């Protein structure tokens, strides 16, 4: 039996995705405009979600981000894409086209993150909760890192998007395992930690640990989409990797 159906409130849809994206990156939350954060000669890593997150429609707003980089003195040759797979499998070429769109797939170098390769990740330190921080070497060595993705609720991290592009997206397997164990109680057999659940951020140790992991990399910028129940854009948030994401979770 259906006990209850909960519908979201009515929200205006974005009709011009490119313009909405450009407005977001030029009027960001918590930091300077993207054009002021990058400089000629920078090697820029764009972090995108994998094939399991195509609902965020990266291919529809990422071209505007790349255009803004190009207009700010960053040519395609200095931009590369890392697919934030976490522990998921690699994406094949057809899936990469679905993520990026045909044009960007043809223009930019694209790499899958490898959570399991010891040479593929760099140790950056340890979080206050004891999580060893291993992050994708290509991202660590980039001059600038820009996170993309989409914001939605998450079963034990409160919300997806934001810092999840780094943890688990760009993290080594030991980092991911230690972080995800925080969703359980400290007692053997104690089950699920009751402070880790949908929409909870403050006091959610999984989310807080993810933020600590992300801070080790300290991306320079973030662009995240927010979608309605029909899969249409209702907002693009951009800016500081935490502040802009947090603002998006409060929509």
What are these regions (language model features)?
Residues 1-24:
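N-terminal amphipathic/basic leader segments beginning at the initiator methionine
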Residues 4-6, 15, 55-56, 147-148, ...:
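Short helix/loop capping segments that flank catalytic or ligand/cofactor-binding pockets
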Residues 29-47, 73-76, 217:
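Glycine-rich phosphate/diphosphate-binding loops that line cofactor/substrate pockets in enzymes
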Residues 54-74:
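Histidine-anchored nucleotide/phosphate-binding helix
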Residues 76-87, 224:
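Short internal beta-strands
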Residues 90-160:
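An acidic, phosphate/nucleotide-engaging active-site surface
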Residues 158-177:
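A short, gly/pro- and small-residue-rich
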Residues 191-251:
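Membrane-embedded hairpin module used as a gating/binding unit in multi-pass transport
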């Amino acid at each position: 039996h259906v006990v209850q159906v909960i519908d979201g409130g009515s929200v205006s849809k974005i009709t011009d995705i490119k313009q909405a994206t450009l407005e977001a990156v030029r009027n960001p939350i918590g930091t300077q405009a993207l054009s002021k954060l990058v400089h000629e000669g920078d090697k820029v890593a764009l972090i995108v979600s994998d094939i399991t997150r195509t609902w965020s429609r990266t291919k529809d707003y990422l071209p505007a981000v790349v255009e803004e980089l190009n207009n700010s003195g960053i040519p395609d040759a200095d931009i590369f894409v890392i697919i934030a797979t976490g522990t998921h499998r690699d994406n094949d070429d057809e899936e990469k086209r679905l993520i990026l769109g045909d044009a960007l797939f043809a223009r930019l170098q694209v790499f899958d993150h490898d959570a399991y390769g010891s040479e593929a990740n760099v140790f950056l330190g340890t979080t206050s909760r004891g999580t060893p921080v291993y992050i994708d070497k290509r991202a660590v060595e980039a001059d600038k890192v820009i996170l993309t993705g989409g914001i939605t609720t998450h079963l034990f991290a409160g919300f997806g998007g934001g810092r999840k592009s780094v943890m688990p997206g760009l993290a080594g397997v030991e980092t991911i395992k230690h972080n995800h164990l925080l969703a359980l109680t400290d007692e053997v057999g104690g089950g699920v930690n009751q402070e880790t659940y949908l929409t909870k951020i403050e006091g959610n140790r999984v989310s807080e640990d993810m933020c600590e992991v992300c801070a080790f990399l300290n991306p320079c910028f973030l662009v995240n989409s927010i979608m309605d129940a029909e899969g249409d854009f209702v907002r693009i948030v951009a800016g500081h990797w935490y502040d802009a994401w947090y603002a998006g979770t409060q929509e």
